[in-house]
Curated annotation (Swiss-Prot):
Ni(2+) binds at H2. Zn(2+) binds at C73, C76, C89, C92. HAMAP family: HypA_HybF (MF_00213). The gene is hypA. The lineage of its organism: Bacteria, Pseudomonadati, Verrucomicrobiota, Methylacidiphilae, Methylacidiphilales. Involved in the maturation of [NiFe] hydrogenases. Required for nickel insertion into the metal center of the hydrogenase. It comes from the Bacteria. Keywords: Metal-binding, Nickel, Zinc. Belongs to the HypA/HybF family. It holds the Pfam family HypA. This is Hydrogenase maturation factor HypA. InterPro entries: Hydgase_Ni_incorp_HypA/HybF_CS, HypA/HybF.
Length: 113
């Protein structure tokens, strides 16, 4: 479960930012995640809760926005946007091959008190 190590790094990063900003508590974190980051949403939420326990990040809501990447269908040979690995082609239901992009995992925004 690499989500835990990702969340431990995320919490450290957020703590540093909170200290720089001089804020007391974090209310909300919005992550943007590409399909090739291989993140399982439930595991990420659980890991965030565990990693943030006892920190200024504890209790913050985690929002995950899935970033679409361009995929190519092997069957109908059309391009389409794909949000998750394993999605079928929206045109024909065929197998989609993802581009090299989509490995992103970034903090899009935070909300503080």
């Amino acid at each position: 479960m690499h989500e835990l190590s990702l969340c431990e790094s995320l919490v450290s990063l957020l703590e540093e930012e909170m200290q720089k900003l001089g804020c007391g508590a974090l209310k909300k974190v919005v992550l943007q995640v590409g399909p090739l980051a291989l993140i399982e949403e439930g595991a990420m939420r659980f890991a965030f809760e565990v990693a943030s326990k006892g920190t200024v990040v504890e209790g913050a809501e985690l929002f995950i926005e899935w970033i679409a990447v361009r995929g190519y269908c092997l069957d109908c040979q059309k391009e389409a946007l794909v949000y998750k690995i394993g999605e079928s082609c929206p045109c024909c239901g065929g197998v989609m091959i993802l581009s090299e992009e989509g490995k992103d995992l970034k903090v899009a925004s935070i909300e503080v008190e």
